[in-house]
Amino acid sequence: MEDDFRALVDRVRASLTSPAEVAAYRALLALVRERTPAAREELARVLVAPEQPLWARETAAYALGTIGDRRAFETLILMLNYRDPVRCATAARALARLGDPRTARAAAALATNPVRVHYALHPIRLLVELRAPESVPALAETLERLLAAREHHWSIARACVEGLGALGDPRAIPVLTKASAYPQLTAAAVAAIARAETAPRS
Protein backbone atom coordinates (compact mmCIF):
# COMPACT_ATOMS: atom_id res chain seq x y z
CA MET A 1 0.00 0.00 0.00
CA GLU A 2 1.44 3.36 -1.00
CA ASP A 3 2.45 5.85 1.69
CA ASP A 4 -0.23 8.42 0.81
CA PHE A 5 -3.01 5.88 1.09
CA ARG A 6 -1.57 4.50 4.31
CA ALA A 7 -1.60 8.01 5.77
CA LEU A 8 -5.23 8.44 4.69
CA VAL A 9 -6.19 5.12 6.28
CA ASP A 10 -4.44 6.01 9.54
CA ARG A 11 -6.10 9.43 9.66
CA VAL A 12 -9.57 8.07 9.02
CA ARG A 13 -9.17 5.16 11.42
CA ALA A 14 -8.18 7.58 14.20
CA SER A 15 -11.39 9.56 13.62
CA LEU A 16 -13.78 6.62 13.93
CA THR A 17 -15.78 6.58 17.15
CA SER A 18 -17.86 3.40 17.13
CA PRO A 19 -17.44 -0.32 16.41
CA ALA A 20 -19.96 0.02 13.59
CA GLU A 21 -17.84 2.68 11.90
CA VAL A 22 -14.71 0.56 12.29
CA ALA A 23 -16.47 -2.42 10.73
CA ALA A 24 -17.78 -0.31 7.86
CA TYR A 25 -14.33 1.07 7.21
CA ARG A 26 -12.76 -2.38 7.18
CA ALA A 27 -15.33 -3.44 4.59
CA LEU A 28 -14.52 -0.37 2.50
CA LEU A 29 -10.78 -1.08 2.67
CA ALA A 30 -11.44 -4.64 1.57
CA LEU A 31 -13.09 -3.26 -1.56
CA VAL A 32 -10.13 -0.98 -2.20
CA ARG A 33 -7.67 -3.85 -1.91
CA GLU A 34 -9.78 -6.13 -4.10
CA ARG A 35 -8.90 -4.16 -7.26
CA THR A 36 -11.57 -5.81 -9.41
CA PRO A 37 -14.13 -4.19 -11.73
CA ALA A 38 -16.90 -5.22 -9.35
CA ALA A 39 -15.10 -3.61 -6.42
CA ARG A 40 -14.63 -0.40 -8.40
CA GLU A 41 -18.35 -0.30 -9.09
CA GLU A 42 -19.04 -0.64 -5.38
CA LEU A 43 -16.61 2.18 -4.61
CA ALA A 44 -18.26 4.37 -7.22
CA ARG A 45 -21.62 3.75 -5.57
CA VAL A 46 -20.19 5.00 -2.28
CA LEU A 47 -19.59 8.37 -3.94
CA VAL A 48 -23.25 8.91 -4.80
CA ALA A 49 -25.13 6.92 -2.18
CA PRO A 50 -27.11 9.06 0.29
CA GLU A 51 -25.97 9.52 3.89
CA GLN A 52 -22.45 8.22 3.32
CA PRO A 53 -19.98 9.64 5.86
CA LEU A 54 -17.31 11.99 4.58
CA TRP A 55 -14.52 9.53 5.38
CA ALA A 56 -16.16 6.89 3.17
CA ARG A 57 -16.51 9.26 0.23
CA GLU A 58 -12.95 10.49 0.65
CA THR A 59 -11.49 6.99 0.79
CA ALA A 60 -13.48 5.77 -2.20
CA ALA A 61 -12.63 8.87 -4.23
CA TYR A 62 -8.93 8.59 -3.47
CA ALA A 63 -8.85 4.90 -4.38
CA LEU A 64 -10.69 5.49 -7.65
CA GLY A 65 -8.83 8.67 -8.51
CA THR A 66 -5.39 7.15 -8.19
CA ILE A 67 -6.31 4.44 -10.71
CA GLY A 68 -7.70 6.97 -13.18
CA ASP A 69 -11.42 6.38 -12.65
CA ARG A 70 -12.99 9.72 -13.54
CA ARG A 71 -16.10 9.07 -11.50
CA ALA A 72 -14.02 10.30 -8.57
CA PHE A 73 -13.58 13.76 -10.06
CA GLU A 74 -16.45 15.65 -8.42
CA THR A 75 -15.77 14.26 -4.95
CA LEU A 76 -12.04 14.97 -5.21
CA ILE A 77 -12.69 18.56 -6.27
CA LEU A 78 -15.04 18.94 -3.31
CA MET A 79 -12.25 17.68 -1.04
CA LEU A 80 -9.73 20.01 -2.71
CA ASN A 81 -12.01 22.90 -1.75
CA TYR A 82 -12.35 21.67 1.84
CA ARG A 83 -11.15 23.70 4.82
CA ASP A 84 -9.03 20.88 6.21
CA PRO A 85 -5.55 21.25 4.63
CA VAL A 86 -4.72 17.57 5.12
CA ARG A 87 -7.84 16.55 3.22
CA CYS A 88 -7.02 19.11 0.51
CA ALA A 89 -3.51 17.69 0.12
CA THR A 90 -4.82 14.14 -0.17
CA ALA A 91 -7.33 15.17 -2.84
CA ALA A 92 -4.65 17.05 -4.78
CA ARG A 93 -2.45 13.97 -4.90
CA ALA A 94 -5.29 11.86 -6.25
CA LEU A 95 -6.31 14.52 -8.78
CA ALA A 96 -2.75 14.72 -10.07
CA ARG A 97 -2.99 11.04 -10.96
CA LEU A 98 -6.57 11.03 -12.16
CA GLY A 99 -5.85 12.26 -15.69
CA ASP A 100 -9.15 14.11 -16.08
CA PRO A 101 -8.92 17.15 -18.41
CA ARG A 102 -11.36 19.03 -16.16
CA THR A 103 -8.91 19.00 -13.27
CA ALA A 104 -6.79 21.96 -14.31
CA ARG A 105 -9.81 24.17 -15.01
CA ALA A 106 -11.31 23.33 -11.63
CA ALA A 107 -8.02 23.88 -9.81
CA ALA A 108 -7.56 27.21 -11.58
CA ALA A 109 -11.05 28.31 -10.53
CA LEU A 110 -10.25 27.49 -6.90
CA ALA A 111 -6.81 29.09 -7.00
CA THR A 112 -8.11 32.36 -8.45
CA ASN A 113 -11.20 32.66 -6.25
CA PRO A 114 -10.59 35.70 -4.01
CA VAL A 115 -13.14 34.45 -1.48
CA ARG A 116 -11.19 31.19 -1.00
CA VAL A 117 -7.68 32.60 -0.88
CA HIS A 118 -7.01 31.00 2.52
CA TYR A 119 -7.50 27.58 0.92
CA ALA A 120 -5.68 28.19 -2.38
CA LEU A 121 -2.37 26.53 -1.46
CA HIS A 122 -3.16 23.01 -2.65
CA PRO A 123 -4.95 24.07 -5.85
CA ILE A 124 -1.86 26.15 -6.65
CA ARG A 125 0.48 23.24 -6.02
CA LEU A 126 -1.74 20.98 -8.10
CA LEU A 127 -1.61 23.42 -11.01
CA VAL A 128 2.18 23.39 -10.83
CA GLU A 129 2.28 19.61 -10.87
CA LEU A 130 -0.17 19.40 -13.78
CA ARG A 131 1.74 21.92 -15.95
CA ALA A 132 -1.49 22.56 -17.80
CA PRO A 133 -2.27 25.51 -20.09
CA GLU A 134 -4.27 27.00 -17.21
CA SER A 135 -1.38 26.83 -14.74
CA VAL A 136 0.68 29.95 -15.51
CA PRO A 137 -2.29 32.29 -16.13
CA ALA A 138 -4.00 31.18 -12.90
CA LEU A 139 -0.89 31.56 -10.75
CA ALA A 140 0.00 34.91 -12.31
CA GLU A 141 -3.55 36.21 -11.81
CA THR A 142 -3.60 35.12 -8.18
CA LEU A 143 -0.18 36.60 -7.46
CA GLU A 144 -1.08 39.88 -9.16
CA ARG A 145 -4.22 40.17 -7.04
CA LEU A 146 -2.40 39.34 -3.80
CA LEU A 147 0.29 41.93 -4.45
CA ALA A 148 -2.37 44.59 -4.93
CA ALA A 149 -4.47 43.53 -1.95
CA ARG A 150 -4.41 45.05 1.51
CA GLU A 151 -3.77 41.60 2.97
CA HIS A 152 -1.08 39.91 0.91
CA HIS A 153 -1.39 36.34 2.27
CA TRP A 154 2.36 35.82 2.02
CA SER A 155 2.29 32.03 2.17
CA ILE A 156 -0.09 31.87 -0.79
CA ALA A 157 1.83 34.56 -2.68
CA ARG A 158 5.08 32.66 -2.09
CA ALA A 159 3.49 29.47 -3.39
CA CYS A 160 2.54 31.34 -6.57
CA VAL A 161 6.06 32.71 -6.97
CA GLU A 162 7.69 29.35 -6.37
CA GLY A 163 5.17 27.65 -8.65
CA LEU A 164 5.80 30.11 -11.46
CA GLY A 165 9.51 29.50 -10.98
CA ALA A 166 9.00 25.76 -11.27
CA LEU A 167 6.96 26.25 -14.44
CA GLY A 168 9.67 28.48 -15.91
CA ASP A 169 7.41 30.42 -18.27
CA PRO A 170 8.59 33.83 -19.57
CA ARG A 171 5.01 35.12 -19.46
CA ALA A 172 5.32 35.24 -15.68
CA ILE A 173 8.30 37.62 -15.66
CA PRO A 174 6.26 40.87 -15.33
CA VAL A 175 4.36 39.76 -12.23
CA LEU A 176 7.46 38.11 -10.76
CA THR A 177 9.32 41.39 -11.20
CA LYS A 178 6.60 43.12 -9.19
CA ALA A 179 6.84 40.42 -6.54
CA SER A 180 10.60 40.88 -6.24
CA ALA A 181 10.01 44.33 -4.74
CA TYR A 182 8.51 42.75 -1.61
CA PRO A 183 11.13 41.56 0.92
CA GLN A 184 9.01 38.53 1.81
CA LEU A 185 9.17 37.38 -1.82
CA THR A 186 12.41 38.83 -3.17
CA ALA A 187 14.62 35.75 -3.04
CA ALA A 188 11.99 33.41 -4.45
CA ALA A 189 10.97 35.90 -7.14
CA VAL A 190 14.55 36.51 -8.29
CA ALA A 191 15.13 32.76 -8.56
CA ALA A 192 11.86 32.34 -10.45
CA ILE A 193 12.74 35.12 -12.88
CA ALA A 194 16.10 33.50 -13.56
CA ARG A 195 14.39 30.23 -14.44
CA ALA A 196 11.83 31.96 -16.63
CA GLU A 197 14.50 33.93 -18.48
CA THR A 198 16.44 30.78 -19.36
CA ALA A 199 13.37 28.77 -20.37
CA PRO A 200 13.13 27.86 -24.07
CA ARG A 201 10.68 30.09 -25.89
CA SER A 202 8.04 28.51 -28.07
Residue ranges and their predicted role:
Residues 1-2, 14, 18-36, 45, ...:
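Structural detector for internal amphipathic alpha-helices that build alpha-solenoid repeat scaffolds
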Residues 11-15, 42-50, 75-83, 106-114, ...:
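Alpha-solenoid HEAT/Armadillo-like helical repeat scaffolds in large eukaryotic proteins
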